[in-house]
């Protein structure tokens, strides 16, 4: 099959990301990339767990963490993972318009999550004086959660760029693997957040 070949809903491959050698290489390269990302976050989690009780003069996390705010942010990000699944479903069914729609919703939900995270950081800073330099816990917290937030921002820019650049190209064996890999990346940062929610916030709320 040709990369730029024109398809219909009936002739589009069920797994377009794996049809061409380029697509397979992107797929393999991405999993290797995720391996490195996993090591990065594992080291940040280990550091946080080692320093979680080193809060110096900062208020305890049981007083600072807002369970309602974090829960809403979590629901936004998890829902965005679901909308990303819908987008890939429509991609595999050669429905470019619906795929773009669900990716747009994914971006809005991700942006909402990022906005709440920025608000959360400002709240901790202004209300409690809890900053990245106020204690070892502060350094570990902002590095871990902030690194994840940076990954979310990168994911939003990545998906947005794909949507804009390929708006006229539509779906083919060149563009489909790019959308698929971006979707996998989005799922990865969602999974990382589940661990952050559990290790940082739930454990922090119980002391």
From Swiss-Prot:
One example GO MF annotation: cytochrome-c oxidase activity
EC identifiers of the protein: 7.1.1.9
CDD domains tied to this protein: Ubiquinol_oxidase_III
Main location: membrane
GO cellular component: plasma membrane
Pfam families: COX3 (PF00510)
Subcellular location(s) of the protein: Cell membrane
Family annotation (Gene3D superfamilies): Cytochrome c oxidase, subunit III, four-helix bundle
Keywords attached to this entry: Cell membrane, Membrane, Translocase, Transmembrane, Transmembrane helix
Superkingdom of source: Bacteria
Record GO biological process: aerobic electron transport chain; aerobic respiration
The reaction(s) this protein catalyses: 4 Fe(II)-[cytochrome c] + O2 + 8 H(+)(in) = 4 Fe(III)-[cytochrome c] + 2 H2O + 4 H(+)(out)
The UniProt record lists the keyword DNA damage: no
Membrane topology of the entry: Multi-pass membrane protein
Membrane-crossing segments per the record: 30-50, 67-87, 101-121, 144-164, 186-206
Family per record: Belongs to the cytochrome c oxidase subunit 3 family.
PANTHER family referenced in this protein's UniProt entry, alphabetically: CYTOCHROME C OXIDASE SUBUNIT 3 (PTHR11403:SF9), CYTOCHROME C OXIDASE SUBUNIT III (PTHR11403)
Record's protein name: Cytochrome c oxidase subunit 3
Source species: Bacillus subtilis (strain 168)
Gene coding for it: ctaE
């Amino acid at each position: 099959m040709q990369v730029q070949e024109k398809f219909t809903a009936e002739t589009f491959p069920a797994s377009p990301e794996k049809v061409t050698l380029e697509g397979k290489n992107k797929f393999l390269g991405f999993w290797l990339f995720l391996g490195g990302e996993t090591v990065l976050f594992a080291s940040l989690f280990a550091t946080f767990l080692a320093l979680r009780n080193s809060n110096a003069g900062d208020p305890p996390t049981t007083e600072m963490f807002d369970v309602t705010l974090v829960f809403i942010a979590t629901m936004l990000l998890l829902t965005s993972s679901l909308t990303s699944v819908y987008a890939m479903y429509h991609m595999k069914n050669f429905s470019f318009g619906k795929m773009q729609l669900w990716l747009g919703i994914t971006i809005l939900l991700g942006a909402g999550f990022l906005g709440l995270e920025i608000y959360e950081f400002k709240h901790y800073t202004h209300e409690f004086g809890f900053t990245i330099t106020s204690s070892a816990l502060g350094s570990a917290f902002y590095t871990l959660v902030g690194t994840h937030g940076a990954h979310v921002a990168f994911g939003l820019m990545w998906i947005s760029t794909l949507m804009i650049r390929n708006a006229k190209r539509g779906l083919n064996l060149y563009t489909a693997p790019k959308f698929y890999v971006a979707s996998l990346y989005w799922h990865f940062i969602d999974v990382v957040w589940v661990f952050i929610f559990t290790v940082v916030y739930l454990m922090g709320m119980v002391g």
